Amino acid sequence: MKPRPGPASQAAAAPEPTPDERTSAKAGPWECVSLVHGFLANSWMLAMLGHRLDRRGYLTKPWGYSNMRCSILVHAEAFSLELARLDADRAVGTIHLVTHSMGGIIARAALERYRPQKLGRFVMLAPPNRGSFMANAAVRVLGGVFKPVAELTTSSESLVNSLGMPADVDIGVIAAGRDALVSAASTRPDVPHAHVTLPCLHSSLLFRRDAADLVAAFLATGEFPDRTPGH
């Protein structure tokens, strides 16, 4: 007859609380991280990164959009409403933004519509802040169907190159050194920011532990830790 599991083994087997359960259990305001995915992706792509940030004590709130044909501005309007909702939530003390790819451009446009009073730091992973050379190649074929493709070209007249950047916000950018969609140079915004490049592909950033470590460090300090060249 097998021994009954003791308290330690029962605790180990207990599932981790959900973000909403932790919100109700914790006294005091949370540091909330709003996660926004990129083009042709979904919130599940952010699950690993969100889990790693949850374990560091943040309350992650993935925000997604399904219609990839809509303009970035349509998604930005919807995301600005989410920011306003979080801003009014008494359980939320700070609203950090962590985005991947086009999600960063949606967040930039949303902040032009609504800037939360509780706005914290802004980390962008592989953002096409100056446009994407892949969008340049695809715009003739896909631009008429998928509006974001035309809005993300490197043209000086494209939407992405006409958007502003939020002022007085700590901005950190993590680029992918082997990115076939967005060059490291194109990830840089035209405002003061911290920047680091990891040797990986565009979407791999979301699954790397070192990328999550960098995100968490920037959210905590407003800086990326020094890294040994090549690592």
Predicted regions and their residues:
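Alpha/beta-hydrolase fold catalytic core
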Residues: 1-31, 47, 54-55, 226-231
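Hydrophobic alpha-helical segments, principally membrane-spanning helices and signal/leader peptides
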Residues: 17, 22-23, 105, 111, ...
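Serine-dependent carboxylesterase/thioesterase catalytic core
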Residues: 28-29, 33-44, 48, 52-66, ...
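C-terminal catalytic-base region of ester-bond hydrolases, centering on the histidine
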Residues: 166-231
